[in-house]
Structure formats: C-alpha cells, structure tokens
C-alpha cells in the first residue's frame, strides 16, 4: 500500500514548523519515537491551541497501525478546531481521506481528497496534500492519466512556494508510479490483467518504467528526508531486480529486514513488490524464497479489502511450482476481486482537473465522515434533496434526535451545518446538469427546480458564491 509512506511524508511536512522533532522522527521512519514525542497531547483535551499536537498523535497512531486509537485522536483534534469552520471542514476531509485510502476504500478516499484540494478554505499545503492523496487513489485504480493530472496540479502549487519538501515528495511519487507500473506491465507478467489493462499516462511512459532513475528537482546539496532517500533507493533496487540484475538481491533482502520496523502493512507490501520484481526479472528462486516468507499473520493483511498483487502472486507462484489446479483457483479469485473493485470503487472517482464535483460524490465523502446514526440522516437528505420544503427539523425527526444535536454532529464531523450540506449538494447537482450536454439544460430555472431551488435570486447568489460564476456562464462554457 503506497499510502503508508506518503501519509508519513505528508504528516511530517505538515508538522515541520510546529513540531520539528516529531517531523524529524517521521522523516527518519522512526514512528515509535514520533508517537512518544506527541503522546502527552492526548491528555490535554480542552486546549484548542493543542490541535496540531493531537493531530500528530493521531497520525503517528495510524502509522503504527493502531487504527482505533488514531480514529479517536482524529475526532479529538477536530473538536479542538474552534477558530475556523473552513479548517474543520478541510481537516475532516483530510483525516477521513487517509483512513479510507489505507483501508482500500478508494471511492470514499477520492471524494475526500477532491473536496480537500478544491476547498477555498484550505491552505496551499492542504491542497497539495489532497492532490497527492487523489493521485495515489487514481494510481491504485490504474488510472494513470488522472493521476498525472493531480500530480501536475500539486507541482504547480508547490512550485509557486518553492517548497523543497513537497517538491521532493512529488518527484518521488512520479518515480514510484513509473517503477511500480513498469514492473506490473512487463511482458513477463502478462497475466496481471488489472495492470496490463490499465491506462498508462504520458509521464509514466516518459520515465520508461523507472529506468531513467530518480531525478529530484530539488537543488543538489539540499538535505533530503531519509524516508525519501531510502524509498528512492529501494525503488531503484526493485527496478534492477525486474531487469534481471542479481546484484540487487542482497540489498533488497536488507530492505525487507528494515521494513519490519515499519509495521506489518508495509512489510507485507514490500514482500509482494519484491516477488513481483523477481518474477518480472525471471529470478524465480528469489520470488519463491520471499513468497514463502509471507507468514499466516501477514496473509491476514493479504485478505484486506483489495489486494490484487498478492492474489496474483499466489496464482503465479502456484503455476511456477506446477500446481495447475491451484493456479487456476487463485487466478479466478484474483480476477473476481479485480472486477469487483472496478465496479464498486470507480463509480465516483473523478479527475482532479474535471470541471465540477458531481452531486453523487457527496454521498461518499460526507457519509464517510459521519457516524452510523447520522449517516441515516444524510441518506434521508439525499433521498429528499429535490424537495424545496426539506428542513433540518424534519431530518432530525427522522432519526429521533433534536435539531440541535443534528447541527452539532454535522458541524463536528463535516465542518458544515446540515442546511449547508443540503445547499451545497443542490448547487453541485445543478452545475452537473448544466454541464451535461445530453440533458440540454436550456432553462436554468427548471434545472434548479429539479434540485429543490425555486428562487432565482437564491440560485444566482448561492451559485456565484460557490463556483465564482453565474449559472448562465456555466452553460456557455
């Protein structure tokens, strides 16, 4: 899972100024020490100025695979954001986006990261982080053109600030994508249908599967976080092994041993990546040795929501060892999982460069941030969004809570009131319809009426505030 490494880098980069020791520990891949440096923040529950420390503590918990503790930490950090509804909304998207990505819930992650990148209340670093998260999601789904778009937008934002840390991270991601996709799309792994059928972006092709090496745009002599440097060296070794270079074997085995310190998720993923590289380089003895190291505890992680690479390796190794029946069985499981993912996860995933968010996307990122009880309220809103008389009082009554409780729950989890959520969904739905040439939306008022907005003045005022243009301008784009 690529998200582990880049979540760590994003966390460290965001905390550099307020928590430099924590950031340095994360950059050194010492997640235990990073947690120890911010653990004391968990007891300071009422201090709003301690928000950054609590957020770092939650990040460190997630890096250490303490998911329940991390989720509680994220909730606490959001409760401490009292100075800005904008920041509460953005941070809520950020926290839920990373959790969703690390759980392989790509549609929800993409929705959250898109919101984060597009939100006018986000800082430029938060927008870059959102775009990086979106690029990771698209890559995991084999949508490399869309991933390139997100990275291009992230680079433009970071270039404008000359931030070397973010620029180096973006360079590393580009190299990562080139190496990982280059290996999976090699001629010796033709049965890896999920990747062989993926779209390959121009940036990836220009890097020739990572054979051009890692060329960061950061000036020579500038200190580079150890986590970035080690990852680049590891990717270079993977590329060499995939090209049949046996001199890469021992350094890669050493990297495997080091990965044990970074948690079972990353260890499992590293082993699978080494197996794929060895198979691509026809180094079957290495592939077999590393595959056999994947113990039962790690295959529990192998049964995560989506893990095509592991399932493919299992089928490929069975075939390599002469177990034709086992290979067919495992390959069937692999294909079923790949198709199921494409059918369920790609529906709401969209390019960062697309003109507008679609209303249907809201059901992912908002519901992902709400508790189960209030997700019922949100579903009720979606089902009745076209009704102009829909009120928050009615929504609250539907789930048997007070209107005040509904307001507080939405504000703390999403950073918006229920009425703001309703208004945003309606305006996004209107905009989506206006941009849909198949609908031929000649009458703006009729289009707005379908989404529950009857007042022309309310439509124009709200639409311009949200999209910085009038509805008529959208039609004539």
UniProtKB/Swiss-Prot annotation:
Positions of the HTH araC/xylS-type domain: 375-477
One protein family per Pfam: HTH_18
DNA-binding region(s) from the entry: 393-414, 444-467
InterPro entries linked to this entry: AraC_XylS_family_regulators (IPR050204), HTH_AraC (IPR018060), HTH_AraC-typ_CS (IPR018062)
Domain of life: Bacteria
Gene Ontology terms describing biological process: positive regulation of DNA-templated transcription; symbiont-mediated perturbation of host programmed cell death
Protein name: Regulatory protein HrpB
Organism of provenance: Ralstonia nicotianae (strain ATCC BAA-1114 / GMI1000) (Ralstonia solanacearum)
Name of the gene encoding the protein in the UniProt record: hrpB
């Amino acid at each position: 899972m690529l998200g582990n490494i880049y979540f760590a880098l994003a966390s460290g980069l965001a905390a550099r100024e307020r928590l430099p020791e924590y950031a340095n520990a994360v950059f050194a891949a010492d997640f235990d020490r990073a947690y120890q440096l911010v653990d004391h923040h968990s007891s300071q529950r009422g201090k709003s100025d301690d928000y950054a420390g609590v957020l770092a503590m939650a990040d460190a918990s997630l890096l250490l695979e303490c998911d329940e503790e991390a989720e509680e930490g994220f909730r606490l950090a959001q409760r401490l954001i009292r100075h800005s509804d904008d920041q509460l909304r953005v941070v809520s998207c950020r926290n839920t986006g990373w959790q969703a990505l690390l759980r392989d819930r790509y549609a929800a992650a993409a929705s959250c990261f898109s919101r984060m990148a597009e939100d006018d209340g986000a800082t430029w670093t938060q927008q870059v982080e959102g775009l990086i998260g979106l690029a990771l999601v698209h890559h995991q789904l084999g949508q490399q053109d869309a991933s390139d778009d997100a990275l291009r937008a992230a680079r433009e934002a970071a270039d404008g600030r000359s931030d070397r840390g973010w620029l180096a991270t973006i360079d590393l991601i580009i190299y990562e994508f080139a190496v990982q996709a280059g290996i999976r799309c090699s001629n010796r792994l033709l049965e890896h249908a999920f990747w062989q059928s993926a779209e390959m972006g121009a940036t990836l092709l220009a890097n020739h599967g990572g054979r051009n090496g890692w060329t960061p745009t950061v000036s020579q002599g500038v200190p580079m976080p150890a986590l970035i440097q080690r990852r680049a060296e590891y990717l270079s070794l993977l590329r060499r092994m995939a090209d049949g270079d046996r001199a890469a074997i021992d350094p890669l085995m050493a990297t495997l041993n080091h990965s044990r310190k970074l948690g079972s998720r990353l260890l499992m993923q590293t082993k699978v990546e080494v197996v794929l590289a060895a198979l691509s380089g026809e180094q079957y003895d290495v592939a077999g040795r590393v595959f056999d190291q994947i113990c039962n505890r790690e295959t529990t992680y192998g049964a995560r929501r989506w893990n095509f690479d592991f399932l493919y390796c299992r089928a490929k190794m069975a075939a390599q060892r002469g177990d034709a029946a086992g290979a067919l069985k495992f390959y069937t499981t692999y294909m079923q999982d790949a198709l199921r993912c494409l059918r369920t996860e790609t529906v709401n995933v969209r390019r960062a460069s697309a003109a507008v968010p679609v209303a249907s996307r809201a059901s992912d990122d908002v519901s992902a941030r709400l508790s189960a009880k209030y997700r019922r309220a949100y579903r009720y809103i979606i089902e009745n969004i076209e009704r102009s008389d829909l009120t928050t009082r009615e929504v609250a009554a539907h789930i048997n809570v007070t209107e005040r409780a509904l307001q507080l729950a939405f504000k703390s989890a999403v950073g918006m009131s229920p009425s703001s959520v309703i208004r945003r969904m309606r305006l996004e739905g209107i905009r989506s319809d206006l941009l849909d040439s198949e609908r031929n939306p000649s009458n703006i008022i009729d289009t707005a009426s379908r989404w529950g907005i009857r007042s022309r003045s309310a439509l124009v005022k709200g639409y311009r505030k949200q999209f910085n243009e009038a509805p008529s301008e959208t039609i004539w784009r």
